[in-house]
């Protein structure tokens, strides 16, 4: 009897204690709903919605390493050894729809290291040494508006502040910005575009017209012509020699990971440049590009260089993300 009463009493005590704990329990608040990042496919691959907004953001960039040998195809001087360079670039694109159209921003951050203090390689197209005959400045802050007609036609107007190149500063020195306007028509066959730019620092203008033709889905060619009212390379938009310059090129995309590129250029002062390369995608996101360039300094360019001919080569390793 005593043992049985003790067991029942212990059980009653446990029930009472459990009841007391249940009565005093703290009710946890409901967790807030988790808003997962949503993919935004309206502007191409890689965009996502910034949480809580209707703005689409893309973050992308690359890391590259260059090894150069032979002559400097810009100045005609002998490198006397290997030149090396590295760059990390991070780009941010934002886009959102408004009653006036798409509102977009673009920002690029670059961190460079070069053994020869050169920063102007690989600014255009599919080439590393693609500015043997330069066509204009490559970096600026700007405000631009682009009209897209929906039928392949587009137009752009921009106000630019200019920027620094390797040896020159093309930044505006007053309240008047550089002004740029352009038209473009694109279709399945290719595209044609023209642009006119006014340099407010030297008060001169330059214009360029380019056409691209897709011969097949793997082979394409292009041609560009330019004219400047100031016959000097020391300007923002017409950095070739003389009044005019012409460029042309071709691209072939091979079935197995390789793209072949060829480009040639000539300007009014007599400089001729040819560049060829093969961009080989070893794995997705990683490309190795060996390239060779030749520049002939003729006419008025002879007085500015040590040698009339320059041969140079470069191998680029680039990881894009």
From Swiss-Prot:
Organism of provenance: Brucella abortus biovar 1 (strain 9-941)
Main subcellular location: membrane
Signal sequence extent: 1-22
Gene: omp2a
Family matches, as Pfam families: Porin_2 (PF02530)
Family in the record: Belongs to the alphaproteobacteria porin family.
Molecular function per GO: porin activity
Subunit structure: Monomer.
Gene Ontology terms: cellular component: cell outer membrane; pore complex
Record text about domains: Consists of 16-stranded beta-barrel sheets, with large surface-exposed loops, that form a transmembrane pore at the center of each barrel. The pore is partially ocluded by a peptide loop that folds into the pore lumen.
Descriptive protein name: Porin Omp2a
Note in the entry: The pore formed by Omp2a is larger than the one formed by Omp2b. Omp2b pores have optimal permeability to allow growth and protection against harmful compounds. The larger pore formed by Omp2a may be advantageous for intracellular growth, when the bacterium is competing with the host cell for nutrients whose concentration is particularly low within the phagosome.
UniProt keyword Flavoprotein, yes or no: no
Highest taxon above the source species: Bacteria
Protein's membrane topology: Multi-pass membrane protein
Job description of the protein: Forms passive diffusion pores that allow small molecular weight hydrophilic materials across the outer membrane.
Keywords: Cell outer membrane, Ion transport, Membrane, Porin, Signal, Transmembrane, Transmembrane beta strand, Transport
